[in-house]
C-alpha cells in the first residue's frame, strides 16, 4: 500500500503544480506542447488540440512544456504567435509562477480540510522542566508563547521547530499570562538525555476547535508553519548546519509515508486519510518553495532570466538560456541520484 499512497500523494502534488503552469499558459495564449505527470518512459497518453497529455512511469515529477521554451522545440526563424518567447514577459512570468502558486493553493485547501476535522493547537505551555532556563526565568504552565526571537508564534509545533533549530544560541521569548505580556531571554541548557540543547518547556499545545471563518485563519497558520519550516531547513543546509543524512529523496519520503500509514491504519480510514493529507500538505508547500529557488532548470531560475529581461528591456537569447537550464537539469538529476542512493543506504543500514 505504501507505493499506492506515494503515487497518489505525489501525483496530486505534481498535477496541481503542472496544472498551474498549464492554466496560466492557456490564459496567456501560450501553446502547451506537452502536459506530463511523471518522468521516464511513457505509460499512457493522448493528443488533443495540439497538446500531448501523458502519464509517465516514475511518479516523481512532471512537465508542462511550452512551444519555443528554451529554444529547443521551435523551428528556426520568427517565433510563432503562440510560442512562449512571443508572449509578453509578464505573461511568461505569471505562467511560470503559477506552478508553485498552485502548490500553495493545494496546501491551503488541504489545511482547511485538516483544521475543519481536527482543529489546531494553541501554543500553551503544559509543563516546565525544573532547573532549566524557562524554570529559572519564572515561566509557568498555562503561559501562552506569543513570539520567539521576534517571530510571531501561532501553533504549538512552532515552539518545537524554533527551539530545535535555535540550538545553543540565546533565545528571546515573549509570552502571555492572564492578559499580560512578559519577555525573557533564555540561554539553552544541554540535556544529556535528549542529546540537544533545551530551554525547558515540557510539553506544549492546547487543542483548539476551529469553527466558521477561524478555519481559514488556522489553515493559513498551518501553511505558514510548513513554509517557514522549509525555508529554515534550507537555510541550515546552506550554512552547513545539516548533514546529508538530514536530506530525504523519494525513497525516504516513501518510507515516511509507509510508517505514518502503518501507524494510522488501525484507527480507521478517516484518521489514515487525515495523516496522509497532512503529509501531502507539507510536501506541496515544500515543492512550491523548492521550485522558487533561483537555480537553473527550476521555476525560480527561469524567473531570474525573465526578471533580467524585464529590467534590461530585451531577452537573453533562448538558446543560451536553454543551455543553462539543461546544465542545471543534469546537475539536479545527479543530485537526485545521490539523494536516492543515500536513502537506500539508510533504508538497509
Residue ranges of model-derived segments:
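Membrane-embedded helix-turn/re-entrant segments that form the catalytic/gating core
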Residues: 26-107, 207-215, 310, 315
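Alpha-helical transmembrane segments of multi-pass membrane proteins
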Residues: 10-14, 65, 103, 107, ...
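Final/C-terminal transmembrane alpha-helix of multipass membrane proteins
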Residues: 323-343
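Functional transmembrane alpha-helices
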Residues: 82-83, 87-90, 188-287, 304-327, ...
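Conserved PDZ fold ligand-binding element
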Residues: 134-156
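Low-complexity, small/polar and acidic-rich linker and loop segments
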Residues: 114-131
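PDZ-domain C-terminal substructure recognizer with occasional recognition of PDZ-binding tails
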Residues: 140, 146-147, 161-203
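Terminal peptide-recognition signature
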Residues: 17, 55, 134, 142-145, ...
